[in-house]
Amino acid sequence: MKPSKLFNPFEEIAGAKALFFGFVVMLITGLTGYFSFTHFPDMISIKYIPEYLPLSYYFVQQVVIWLIPSLIFYVFALIGSSSSVRVVDIFGTMALARFPYIIAAVLGFSGSMKRFGDYLMALFMEHDTTATISTFDIVTAIVVMFLMLLLTVWLVALMYNAFRISSNLKGGKAVGLFIAGLFISIIATMLVNIWLYGLWA
């Protein structure tokens, strides 16, 4: 596979095909997240919370962080594009764009993030000077955080290309509408997920 395909597979995979593979991606991400305690509190955030919640919560969360942005970007595509925009293209490519977060869910199996978080909490919030953590856990947690950052950048790049190609937009208009859609989507998915968490927790 060419490196460019990792950031823009949508020239070859779009429409119903992208939607199908996108659903598979969300299914795998939700299932893996359930076992690794990986949450996605908004469309781009990743959190590892060792808390038992039903599998249905993880699947609904995947739907929320895909459906809301897809709706928002579809509206923005209709506003900005002079050509016809197919619903299935926007929704399909936005679903497929989430495939980097399968890796994020797998990273949740590392307990180092939890131990690092507990250590910082004890040290700075509880002022527990006896708190300890291994060098291995610190290094692993830092590596995981760095990988999370790369995965987030990868996701955003994929979503931009999905929006740009599906809406037939270019240049400043594509960038401006995407940034606006991204900001609104983050806020909207965060608020809905807070409400959902309250229902399941």
Predicted regions and their residues:
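Hydrophobic alpha-helical transmembrane segments and adjacent short intramembrane/lumenal linkers
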Residues: 89-178, 184, 188
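Alpha-helical transmembrane spans of integral membrane proteins, capturing the lipid-embedded, hydrophobic core
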Residues: 22-30, 58-71, 94-98, 102, ...
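Alpha-helical transmembrane segments with an aromatic anchor "belt"
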Residues: 49-123
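Juxtamembrane boundary at the C-terminal end of a transmembrane helix
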Residues: 187-201
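N-terminal juxtamembrane cytosolic/stromal segments of multi-pass membrane proteins
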Residues: 1-53, 76
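Membrane-helix interface motif
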Residues: 34-44, 109-122, 195-198
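Hydrophobic, aromatic-rich alpha-helical transmembrane segments
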Residues: 15-19, 47, 51-59, 63, ...
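Alpha-helical transmembrane segments and their helix-start/interface "positive-inside/aromatic belt" motifs
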Residues: 5-25, 88-99, 172-179
